[in-house]
């Protein structure tokens, strides 16, 4: 029970911080944190909640299938399946899914992936070589959630990572809440920088074409 309370507090603090950045507009987004590994349980944001508010109903505990562990009238977020795929296939400890203007713009500029390079902040992703290059996959935003989940699952390749969904934000996961938040901040910095650079240069770089 102590672990549940500790993780609830940790997730609540992350929600507060991301809210101050306006990364949950119009109740969008969802975040989760692992509570136990065996059996797998995790806390996830309840569906349709105003994340600028803090209430006792912000999160609910679900199992490896995303089913509530305790009887509740709350519903887990619609994209809970993305979280279950991550937790069931990795040792990740936290998953963050946010909608920002920048990450949505990026998915309209590129088709299957965006390539970013030569930025010092890439080291926040545990990539240390000089002039490092990263590739972030972009998948289509299917309204059929199982199809979205299956396409998403193909890009889960470790205890940390990120996937962009076209016009539907980014999902980032990490070893724990600190790692996940650090990675999310790094990706959003890279997106913002890239878009500003393109606005100065007047075109899409990396050899990619504008996607629509």
UniProtKB/Swiss-Prot annotation:
Q: Name one GO molecular function term.
A: methylthioribulose 1-phosphate dehydratase activity
Domain of life the protein comes from? Bacteria
Cited InterPro entries: Aldolase_II/adducin_N, Aldolase_II/adducin_N_sf, MethylthioRu-1-P_deHdtase_MtnB
Q: Which reaction equation describes what this protein catalyses? A: 5-(methylsulfanyl)-D-ribulose 1-phosphate = 5-methylsulfanyl-2,3-dioxopentyl phosphate + H2O
Entry annotated with the keyword Magnesium = no
Q: Sorted alphabetically, which Gene3D superfamilies does this protein's record hold?
A: Class II aldolase/adducin N-terminal domain (3.40.225.10)
EC numbers on record: 4.2.1.109
Named cofactor requirement(s):
Zn(2+)
Question: Sorted alphabetically, which keywords does the UniProt record give?
Answer: Amino-acid biosynthesis, Lyase, Metal-binding, Methionine biosynthesis, Zinc
**Protein's UniProt keywords contain Amino-acid biosynthesis:** yes
Which positions does UniProt annotate for Zn(2+) binding? 97, 99
Q: In which pathway does it act?
A: Amino-acid biosynthesis; L-methionine biosynthesis via salvage pathway; L-methionine from S-methyl-5-thio-alpha-D-ribose 1-phosphate: step 2/6
Cofactor info, note text: Binds 1 zinc ion per subunit.
What Pfam families does the record tag this protein with? Aldolase_II
Question: What SUPFAM superfamilies does the entry give?
Answer: AraD/HMP-PK domain-like
Extract one GO cellular component term from the record.
Answer: cytoplasm
What processes does the entry annotate via GO biological process terms? Answer: L-methionine salvage from methylthioadenosine
Q: Record's family? A: Belongs to the aldolase class II family. MtnB subfamily.
Q: How does it assemble?
A: Homotetramer.
Chain's role: Catalyzes the dehydration of methylthioribulose-1-phosphate (MTRu-1-P) into 2,3-diketo-5-methylthiopentyl-1-phosphate (DK-MTP-1-P).
**Name of the featured protein:** Methylthioribulose-1-phosphate dehydratase
What is the source species?
A: Bacillus thuringiensis subsp. konkukian (strain 97-27)
Source species taxonomy:
Bacteria, Bacillati, Bacillota, Bacilli, Bacillales
| GN (gene name) | mtnB
């Amino acid at each position: 029970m102590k672990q549940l309370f500790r993780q609830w507090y940790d997730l609540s603090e992350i929600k507060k911080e991301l809210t101050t950045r306006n990364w949950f507009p119009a109740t969008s987004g969802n975040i989760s944190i692992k509570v136990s590994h065996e059996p797998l349980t995790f806390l996830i944001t309840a569906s349709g909640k105003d994340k600028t508010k803090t209430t006792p109903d912000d999160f609910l505990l679900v199992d490896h299938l995303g089913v509530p562990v305790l009887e509740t009238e709350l519903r887990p977020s619609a994209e809970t399946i993305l979280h279950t795929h991550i937790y069931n296939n990795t040792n990740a400890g936290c998953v963050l899914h946010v909608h920002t203007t920048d990450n949505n713009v990026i998915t309209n500029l590129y088709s299957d992936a965006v390539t970013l390079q030569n930025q010092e902040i890439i080291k926040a992703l545990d990539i240390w070589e000089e002039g490092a290059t990263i590739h972030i996959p972009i998948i289509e935003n299917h309204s059929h959630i199982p199809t979205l989940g299956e396409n998403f699952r193909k890009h889960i390749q470790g205890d940390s990572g990120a996937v962009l969904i076209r016009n539907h934000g980014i999902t980032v996961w990490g070893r724990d809440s600190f790692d996940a938040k650090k990675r999310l901040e790094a990706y959003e910095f890279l997106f913002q920088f890239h878009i500003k650079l393109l606005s100065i240069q007047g075109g899409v770089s990396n050899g990619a074409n504008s996607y629509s």
